[in-house]
Amino acid sequence: MDNSSPIYTEFLPISRADMEARGWDQLDFVVVGGDAYVDHPSFGTAIISRLLEAEGYKVGVLAQPRYSDCEDFKRFGRPKYGFFIGGGNVDSMVSHYSVAKIPRAEDEYSPGGIGGARPDRSATVYTRLAKEAYPDLPVILGGLEASLRRFAHYDYWLDTVLPSIAEDSGADLISFGMGEHQTVEIARRLAAGEPVESITDVDGTCYLTDFDHLPEKYVECAGFRKVASDKVAYAKACRIQMDNQDVVSGQIIVQKQSEKYLVQNIPAKPLVRWELDKVYALPYTRRYHPIYESMGGVPAVREVQFSIIQNRGCFGGCNFCAIQLHQGRRVTSRSADSIVAEAERMTHEPDFKGYIHDIGGPTANFRFPSCREQMLRGMCNGGKHCLAPTTCSHMIVDHSDYLKILRRVRELPGVKKVFIRSGIRFDYLMADPDDTFFKELVEYHVSGQLKVAPEHCAPNTLAYMGKPPIQTFNKFKDKFYELSRKAGKKQYLVPYLMSSHPGSTLSDAVYLAEYLYKNHMRPEQVQDFYPTPGTVSTCMFYTGLDPYTLKPVFVEKTAEGKALQRALLQYYEPRNAEKVIKALKMTHREDLIPLLVPAEGRRAVQRSARRAEPAEVTIHNDGTYTVRPNKGRGGRNQSRGTAPARTAGGRQPSPGARFAPNGTAPRKPKNDQQKENTVWKTSKKKK
């Protein structure tokens, strides 16, 4: 191995001064991103900007521009050919809001981890500002946020259906998917003088046109206005979109928006091995730009700085995952030499301590396409999955190539440990008759904890998630702990679990809580289902229908119902006791209360219930009254006071009147819940 591998230190220009330092008067392209500028291949802005640079273009990076006006988009002056824009690694709405729609204060992809550096719907806002700054310049919009909004889509934050982002943003082209092929071809044609309006035949792009200019052959799904008013039409459109995302079998899709028609060309071909190797060998500095140093850097770089991406795509088929509509289901991977060379280069970094945090990708242990048939016929459609509910008989299961790479990296001088943190697909691992990889995974590549994603255990919920049955996870779990014991290691599984996914009833959540209790599992982190654009699960959430069968699906949308399901996943927490008890009573599973609810939690709920019981007020003929609080308010203690004056006509207040224990009228209840908690009993003693 060549120990003279270069360490790259030069960032691309971020200002006019940087341009002038390179002797440039004008840029060819400006790449705009919603994240802080991190020159690392885990960041889309870094890949697109370095790729354009490698093609010979003069490129500047405009990271998290000010969005109050368009002046920041004029920072470099007018670019020669146009803008490439992305919203960031994470959807800006997910970055800004929790699933409960509560604003987040933190943003791992911004300087200092502080939120607010980008606008809501940043991809749309940036595109509009670029068009405002230079109305006649081409603007190509790509990245995750745009890819998942290329069709008319349900927007969870507004609780409505919106048209394609192509219409809303005013972009000339939408580049969906990973984008390298599209970027290079569009840049080449713009540089050759071709008007952007005529660039309508690039695979992996969408554009708006009128009816007279639609392509000759296409499949049409229901238009924006139809899917916004008809949930069956929305579900059918979702299936058409999902069934045409394969590079072999996919067809051009047309969907009418408000006025014009959106045309999605077939997906771009995935990068082949040598192309992936080239992309990941570009001169990334692998760091955040030094302008962020005084602000505490960019937190997101910490986990990826010494991590290696070895593959793209995922045939796992989880219905709640956006990878199918973005990266696609066809898996491609880098060569062993490329991965080892990147690892070797890391060992010369001044901050490297000997630990490579990850060699993985969307799913770490996928290296090749799932079967040979897909190369000829494409991936299976109609909601069929390679791994769920059972492993397809055509599946090629092989960890040997991945294992060879891990062994080579482990042997590099300066490397102490190589971890796998991006997620192991346990059902694929269990389908491998050769357990050599499993043994070495346990012995060498677990940093004390291994993250896995069973997500749930109820058969009904798992089916709607597109996940394998829980029995597969149980076998994996047992073998993991068995191999860990044999290796003399104390290691643990950290399961990812999800509540309130479409199809998950309260009974399903109770079933999951019982499973966790019986298996001595106490998840520290759980999440509610987050309905983001572009997934089958979000379609089910909005329509209440399975898009492949059109059969009804239960969807928990109430805040209380979601809270109960979430509490059951952490049943052992005393703070969740009241919700857990309520859920168990609602599902007639009171038998589980002594098991799932800690004694401390049960006592707290009992105290709370006693405090909520009404006190008894006795009014005496001498104008005084006595209050007998319930046991939670002091047991047998009594308090005396002076009753309010008699009303006109000499009548005592009606039996329904309310009194406070100190003899004064209580404050008016603020809401119905408080009203229920402040009811007082009154009784009048006879003379």
Give the label of every model feature segment.
Residues 44, 63-257, 264-265:
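Glycine-rich beta-alpha loop elements in corrinoid/cobalamin-binding modules
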Residues 2-26, 36, 232-307:
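N-terminal [4Fe-4S]-dependent radical SAM core
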Residues 31, 47, 66-67, 345-494, ...:
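Conserved SAM/AdoMet-binding glycine-rich loop
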Residues 608-613, 617-687:
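Intrinsically disordered, Lys/Arg-rich low-complexity segments
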Residues 68, 197-246, 259, 268-271, ...:
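Terminal amphipathic helices with adjacent charged low-complexity linkers/tails
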Residues 91-100, 148-150, 180-185, 209-213, ...:
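Flexible glycine/acidic-rich beta-alpha junction loops that bind and position SAM and/or redox cofactors
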Residues 35, 295-322, 347, 355:
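N-terminal pre-triad scaffold of radical SAM enzymes
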Residues 172, 279, 314, 339, ...:
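Conserved, mostly hydrophobic/aromatic
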